[in-house]
Structure formats: structure tokens, C-alpha cells
């Protein structure tokens, strides 16, 4: 097990072992993911484009500031801005069959796709979710496609909570469905997945 860290600026590195790295100030990670060196790391851009990279390819460094830019270790480009980073086992069969990835955009579009549809490590980027013009991806989460609830929260303090099974799984190139109606000046700023009681 190792830790994969990514800064706000997009510097990425991995630790040599499973000791959680200590960071502070400019060296603090925006994303910190625990993974096996055999896992696949997914970098997801705000545009909905994504890249899959074998964890062992990510450069090892003592400090995140010594890492490499995400677009140097993946097929994403320097024009991409990261929205999420997550890890999956290289053998997706190790996950429950119904495991899904849930994406949410700032305009409230929500989509669920089976992780079995995600490609493995490749030199090509792929579309995780179709993001409409002017919109951007804000959240990516994993769920079991069964007993969870989804909470969306907006900048103006509105919220909606609904059952996960209200959203059916769709293919990777789909844009998704409208998760909530928004006021013209409002936008979704957060999405969480909760277990039901």
C-alpha cells in the first residue's frame, strides 16, 4: 500500500510505503488516495475527460513539491484542470458487481455509471461524463448502487437528498440527468453519498 498525493497545482507523487505523509502549507495535498501499487489511478478533469494510470508509474517522492505534473504521467493535457482523483483495483472483479461511479456538475447534472465500464491504464484519455458547454464537473464518488442516499448542496444554501436508486446507471458518454432545479444565479457546490439508516 502507498499514498498518492496531488496538490491544487496538479503535482502528483506517491510514497514509498503505507505511512501517511505529513504535509503542510503549499505542500498540502488537495487529494490523498491510499492505493496498492497494482491499482489503477484515475485523474478526472472538470471537462469530464479522464485518464487511467497504473499506480506504480506515478513517481515516488518524499515531498509533494518534488512530484510531477499530472499531465506528464497521464494522457490529460496542461489545459485540463483536475476535479477528482481516485483509485480502483486493477481487477475490478474484486469490487462488488454493482459498484458505480457517481458524477455531479455545477449545474446539477448527475450521472451514475458502472465501474466495470471504466477502461484500465491507457495512453489515451477517455470521456467519463459528457459535460455540457459552460458547465463543469465538481464531484466524483464511488457507491454500491443500492442502499445509499445522495445529497446535493448549492451556493445559495438549497439542498436536496434522494435515494441513489432514483438514478439509473448510464454509459460513459452520457451527460446524466438533472439532479435538482437551480435558480438562474445558483450552482451546486457539493455532493455527498451517505449510507441509509
How does the language model describe each region?
Residues 1-197:
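Short, structured "edge-of-domain" segments at secondary-structure transitions
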Amino acid at each position: 500500500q502507498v499514498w498518492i498525493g496531488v496538490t491544487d497545482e496538479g503535482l502528483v507523487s506517491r510514497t514509498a510505503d503505507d505511512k501517511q505523509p505529513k504535509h503542510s502549507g503549499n505542500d498540502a495535498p488537495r487529494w490523498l488516495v491510499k492505493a496498492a501499487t497494482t491499482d489503477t489511478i484515475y485523474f478526472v478533469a472538470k471537462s469530464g475527460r479522464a485518464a487511467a494510470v497504473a499506480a506504480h508509474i506515478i513517481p515516488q517522492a518524499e515531498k509533494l513539491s518534488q512530484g510531477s505534473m499530472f499531465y506528464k504521467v497521464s494522457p490529460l493535457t496542461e489545459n485540463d484542470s483536475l476535479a477528482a482523483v481516485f483509485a480502483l483495483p486493477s481487477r475490478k472483479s474484486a469490487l462488488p458487481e454493482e459498484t458505480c461511479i457517481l458524477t455531479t456538475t455545477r449545474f446539477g447534472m448527475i450521472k451514475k455509471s458502472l465501474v466495470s465500464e471504466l477502461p484500465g491504464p491507457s495512453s489515451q484519455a477517455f470521456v467519463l461524463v459528457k459535460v455540457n458547454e459552460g458547465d463543469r464537473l465538481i464531484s466524483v464518488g464511488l457507491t454500491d448502487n443500492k442502499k445509499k442516499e445522495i445529497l446535493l448542496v448549492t451556493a445559495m444554501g438549497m439542498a436536496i437528498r434522494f435515494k441513489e436508486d432514483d438514478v439509473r446507471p448510464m454509459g460513459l458518454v452520457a451527460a446524466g440527468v438533472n439532479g435538482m432545479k437551480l435558480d438562474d444565479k445558483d450552482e451546486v457546490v457539493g455532493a455527498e453519498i451517505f449510507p441509509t439508516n
